[in-house]
Swiss-Prot record:
<comment type="subunit">
    <text>Homodimer.</text>
</comment>
<keyword id="KW-0547">Nucleotide-binding</keyword>
<comment type="function">
    <text>Catalyzes the attachment of threonine to tRNA(Thr) in a two-step reaction: L-threonine is first activated by ATP to form Thr-AMP and then transferred to the acceptor end of tRNA(Thr). Also edits incorrectly charged L-seryl-tRNA(Thr).</text>
</comment>
<comment type="similarity">
    <text>Belongs to the class-II aminoacyl-tRNA synthetase family.</text>
</comment>
<dbReference type="InterPro" id="IPR004154">
    <property type="entry name" value="Anticodon-bd"/>
</dbReference>
<keyword id="KW-0694">RNA-binding</keyword>
<dbReference type="InterPro" id="IPR004095">
    <property type="entry name" value="TGS"/>
</dbReference>
<dbReference type="Pfam" id="PF02824">
    <property type="entry name" value="TGS"/>
</dbReference>
<feature type="binding site">
    <location>
        <position position="510"/>
    </location>
    <ligand>
        <name>Zn(2+)</name>
    </ligand>
</feature>
<feature type="region of interest" description="Catalytic">
    <location>
        <begin position="242"/>
        <end position="533"/>
    </location>
</feature>
<dbReference type="GO" id="GO:0006435">
    <property type="term" value="P:threonyl-tRNA aminoacylation"/>
</dbReference>
<dbReference type="InterPro" id="IPR033728">
    <property type="entry name" value="ThrRS_core"/>
</dbReference>
<dbReference type="InterPro" id="IPR002314">
    <property type="entry name" value="aa-tRNA-synt_IIb"/>
</dbReference>
<keyword id="KW-0820">tRNA-binding</keyword>
<dbReference type="InterPro" id="IPR047246">
    <property type="entry name" value="ThrRS_anticodon"/>
</dbReference>
<dbReference type="GO" id="GO:0005524">
    <property type="term" value="F:ATP binding"/>
</dbReference>
<keyword id="KW-0479">Metal-binding</keyword>
Length: 639
């Protein structure tokens, strides 16, 4: 007898080997129809998988995350099936699942057109409607190589040839198409109903620019029509909010071909940058951080000690001078340890907090660059806390509360918390890891945060908390980090004198709240769709005249506004052009300014202004003092 244990703890008995589909059918016809796969322990398997011994089993449906993964994986194969039907000369390569969808790479004699994409999607729907069974078979490696060579699928043959000789490989067939795959897959193509092809892009075979350029077709697939529509709507919103588009329209920045992956900030964009940086500088100052500044170029011997030269060199920009090798720093932490090591440190000096707006460089591949979100040169709000193990809990608790306030001030209220715990390969004692992991989790509990645990996802040198923002359209951005590090102080020989008079290693806490300032500003632009809160807006007020008779009055208003707030002048522009007032209002509205002040003869005579708020809201005529009170309140409340 074979005993199958279901998720609710109940058991079912079977006389002999039984498939996942048969177990589902024994539970109910509805579940049998909905079943996409099965999960035995942590392994997801086909519904045709035969269970030969007592096992725990859950039936995977479209409602499960694993079910969505199977749908997307199978839809990638459906895409390849449709392409081969329409373009028999195309060669298939690989087609993995990615975030929110999938892609498949093809080799073909000409580029696929938008019309081709529409035809492929239509053919996919037709093939899905046939509800053809998806059938798995296993071949010895060499036989599989010969099989795909015989089909003219040389890329597939190359992939299989790289597999060890003694391994078998699995193939999946649907209708007239068969593909190499580990699986699992849906039981039939009829399970694939809600998908859309998104775009075609270029991709090098095996990611190597020396190889042939392939065509990558991207698609998305979902469990329900509603989820697909929600996702497509989110993409439409994301396109409207695209920071690259808004950066051009609002004249904030540009990326230039002469320096790919680095940002040219225009005056308005640099004003925004300065506001973010000065805010974070106040955060440093008000929370016990000492701001420091380290060099950007450091000798390779330092990077050898930290392990970066061995493990990370391909991502570093290197140079040579006077027969010495140097690298542009990809991170700030080694420099902070060098500062810590200057002079003798006592246990009384701990915790010692350093903060730096450190410019870093990483040699990201060109294909991975994305506006100001993914760049090669970036600045971090990088902080490092040198402390003892006993300090970790208090430091992490204070940091989480601080991070929550910062995110709230920038308009983010939905934060996801994750604790990444010890991997199998690690340094440090189990006792130290126990203490550090407990401190991280307790710090989140003390801050009232619900969190998930990511077992084994910590770095080899310590556990960490990841803080992820959820934006206005549901996208997630991992920005903040609190990383415990037992390793780098050891590697770079950092010490302090303990209460016992002996030498001890400090624990190092790496922390960043916004992370890359470039990326965070990109997130801010997209979160607010370019309509930045008043306190961040590069231009807060535009003063417009109706006729030339109000020019001097408008200049006077602007001058008063620029001096209106103590320690903070308002950012004001005047528009005195001889243009229709409706034209000028529209132009400044498109720049998403928080306020537009209009002055005609009546306003000039009354010593007042007509106020228009963003969103075409007419607030009527008010005195300049009343307007200053209004905008001061906006700035103070960070709206």
């Amino acid at each position: 007898m074979i005993h199958i244990t279901l998720p609710d703890g109940s058991q079912r008995e079977f006389a002999g080997p039984v498939t996942v589909a048969e177990v589902a059918a024994s539970i109910g016809s509805g579940l049998a129809k909905a079943a996409l796969a099965g999960k035995i322990g942590d392994k997801v398997v086909d519904t045709s998988y035969q269970i030969t011994q007592d096992s725990p089993l859950s039936i995977v449906t479209a409602k499960d995350a694993d079910g969505l993964e199977v749908i997307r994986h199978s839809t990638a194969h459906l895409l390849a099936y449709a392409v081969k039907e329409l373009f028999p000369d195309a060669q298939v390569t690989i087609g993995p699942v990615i975030e929110n969808g999938f892609y498949y790479d093809f080799s073909y004699k000409r580029p696929f057109t938008p019309e081709d994409l529409a035809a492929i999607e239509k053919r996919m729907a037709e093939l899905a409607a046939k509800d053809e069974p998806v059938v798995r078979r296993v071949l010895p490696r060499d036989e599989a190589v010969a099989y795909f060579k015989g089909l003219g699928e040389h890329y597939k043959a190359e992939i299989i040839a790289s597999i060890p000789t003694n391994e078998d490989v699995s193939l999946y067939r649907e209708g007239g198409f068969e593909d190499l795959c580990r699986g699992p897959h849906v039981p039939s193509t009829g399970k694939l109903k809600f998908f859309k092809l998104m775009k075609v892009a270029g991709a090098y075979w095996r990611g190597d620019h020396r190889n042939e350029m392939l065509q990558r077709i991207y698609g998305t697939a979902w469990a329900t029509k509603e989820e697909l529509q929600e996702y497509l709507h989110m993409l439409e919103e994301a396109e409207k909010r695209d920071h690259r588009k808004l950066g051009r329209e609002l004249d904030l920045f540009h990326i230039d071909e002469h320096s790919p992956g680095t940002v040219f900030w225009h005056p308005k964009g640099w004003t925004l940058w300065q506001e973010v940086e000065q805010y974070m500088r106040r955060v440093y100052r008000d929370n016990g951080y000492q701001e420091v500044k380290g060099p950007q170029i450091l000798d390779k011997t330092l990077w050898e000690k930290t392990g970066h030269w061995d493990k990370y060199r391909d991502n570093m920009f290197t140079t040579e001078s006077e027969k010495r090798d140097y690298a542009l720093k990809p991170m700030n932490c080694p420099g902070h340890i060098l500062i810590f090591k200057q002079g003798i440190k006592s246990y009384r000096d701990l915790p010692l907090r350093y903060g730096e707006f450190g410019q870093c460089h990483r040699n990201e591949p060109t294909g991975g660059l994305h506006g100001i979100m993914r760049v090669r040169g970036f600045t971090q709000d990088d902080g490092h806390i040198f402390c003892t193990e006993d300090h970790i809990l208090a430091e992490c608790t204070a940091y989480t509360a601080l991070l929550q306030k910062v995110y709230k001030d920038f308009g983010f209220h939905n934060i996801i918390y994750k604790v990444a715990t010890r991997p199998e390969a690690r340094i440090g004692s189990d006792e130290s890891w126990d203490k550090a992991e407990h401190a991280l989790m307790e710090s989140l509990r003390a801050s009232g945060c619900e969190f998930e645990i990511a077992p084994g996802d910590g770095a080899f040198y310590g556990p960490k908390i990841e803080y992820t923002l959820k934006d206005a359209i549901g996208r997630q951005w991992q920005c903040g980090t609190m990383q415990v590090d037992f390793s780098m102080p050891e590697r770079l020989d950092a010490e302090y004198v303990g209460e016992d008079g002996g030498r001890h290693r400090p624990v190092m806490l790496h922390r960043a709240i916004v992370g890359s300032l470039e990326r965070f500003i990109g997130i801010l632009i997209e979160e607010h769709a370019g309509a930045l809160p008043v306190w961040l807006a590069p231009v807060q007020v535009a003063v417009l005249n109706i006729t030339d008779a109000q020019q001097d009055y408008c200049r006077e208003i602007a001058a008063k506004l620029q001096k209106a707030l103590p320690n903070q002048g308002l950012r004001v522009v005047t528009d005195l052009r001889n243009e229709k007032i409706t034209y000028k209002i529209r132009e400044h509205s498109l720049q998403k300014l928080p306020y537009i002040l209009v002055a005609g003869d009546k306003e000039k005579a009354a010593g007042a202004v007509a106020v228009r708020a963003r969103g075409n809201k007419d607030l009527g005529v008010m005195s300049l003092d009343a307007f200053v009170d209004l905008i001061a309140q906006d700035i103070a409340s960070k709206v």
